[in-house]
Amino acid sequence: MGQVLPLVTRQGDRIAIVSGLRTPFARQATAFHGIPTVDLGKMVVGELLARSEIPAEVIEQLVFGQVVQMPEAPNIAREIVLGTGMNVHTDAYSVSRACATSFQAVANVAESLMAGTIRAGIAGGADSSSVLPIGVSKKLAYVLVDVNKARTMSQRLKLFSRLRLRDLMPVPPAVAEYSTGLRMGDTAEQMAKTYGITREQQDALAHRSHQRAAQAWSDGKLKEEVMTAFIPPYKQPLVEDNNIRGNSSLADYAKLRPAFDRKHGTVTAANSTPLTDGATAVILMTESRAKELGLVPLGYLRSYAFTAIDVWQDMLLGPAWSTPLALERAGLTMSELTLIDMHEAFAAQTLANIQLLGSERFAREVLGRAHATGEVDDSKFNVLGGSIAYGHPFAATGARMITQTLHELRRRGGGFGLVTACAAGGLGAAMVLEAE
């Protein structure tokens, strides 16, 4: 076991997560069609503060993230402060770590708490795949800059004459890695082939995810942590996530064609997480500040770890890399965990990470560790379903996982929970949570 790194303030306070809330998650171009990311963020933070009844002046910092950037609101965190009636003096800044963005937001607030610069803060993230920053071609952008500097109409017309019809076409946001040109689904296909993940295994995991998420909603387990969203024209509120397939069968999954490798692939739209809109936020405090306010925390942040690997081959192995480090810093082993929640970007990616967490060879030859991190107990794993079912608003997923895991730990009488995710750029994130 390596060095244990306790997450405590200088006064010995633990980092408490006192509450968490999210919007329902909606598939792209459905319930949140036309609602920009900043409005989703304001929606969830405003409701979180109203429900908590914590005075606005208690919150000293807000760290918030988005992955699909809004050019008109680059510092989304500050816009949320100004748009929710929070104290205008509240410090606010934005972060982005791809699919691990709200993990990063939580870590940043925790670090401010440990440093003693604040005693309470909000962390979260939001994304909209329905309101996208549509760009222009490089040639049109180049010409527009020159046109802005041109002094005469003839100069402007001469510049515009260089353009062709194709240069005027809108350019949607890239869905591929900037450095490699590979789409996330291409990487998932790589991983399926590298680790021998079959189509049947992927479909079975996706089916399991939807079944468990549907059951969680049916049992009322998510009501406390998901707000009702009222959206224009205010005729039909959104109460639940709208991606979950409650009545699907494995036979339904088998009907879909591969989405990326059309000839030989196994990754489909059904065994991948869909493009999604939504927002999530959590309130963190020092343990003593929570006691002063008479608040009972959902739980505590025990440790966290971020890792990075190469992006050319099998880059979505973040959980296999970050989990052993987070467990080491928490002073725990895999067998001591009560719950394990892993982000399901793709079923292939999820199954590959599960395989490597239990691999002695991977531990020795790749991680340089003496033993495997540990086998993933299916009875502890994604017990309420995962991102394939709920959806994945990129910056919101981490905080969803944290809130969901802490509530489930409390229902089980406490214990330790691991939340972990892969992210674009070969990044990985893991956090160990504790509930009493």
UniProtKB/Swiss-Prot annotation:
Family: Belongs to the thiolase-like superfamily. Thiolase family.
Molecular function GO labels: acetyl-CoA C-acyltransferase activity
Keywords: Acyltransferase, Cytoplasm, Fatty acid metabolism, Lipid degradation, Lipid metabolism, Transferase
Subcellular location field: Cytoplasm
Entry superkingdom: Bacteria
Pathway the protein takes part in: Lipid metabolism; fatty acid beta-oxidation
The protein's Enzyme Commission number: 2.3.1.16
Function text: Catalyzes the final step of fatty acid oxidation in which acetyl-CoA is released and the CoA ester of a fatty acid two carbons shorter is formed.
Quaternary organization: Heterotetramer of two alpha chains (FadJ) and two beta chains (FadI).
Active site residues per record: C99, H392, C422
Entry GO CC: cytosol
Protein name: 3-ketoacyl-CoA thiolase
Swiss-Prot/TrEMBL catalytic activity: an acyl-CoA + acetyl-CoA = a 3-oxoacyl-CoA + CoA
Keyword Acyltransferase set for record: yes
Lineage: Bacteria, Pseudomonadati, Pseudomonadota, Gammaproteobacteria, Enterobacterales
PROSITE patterns attached to this UniProt entry: THIOLASE_1 (PS00098), THIOLASE_2 (PS00737), THIOLASE_3 (PS00099)
Class of enzymatic activity (EC top level): transferase
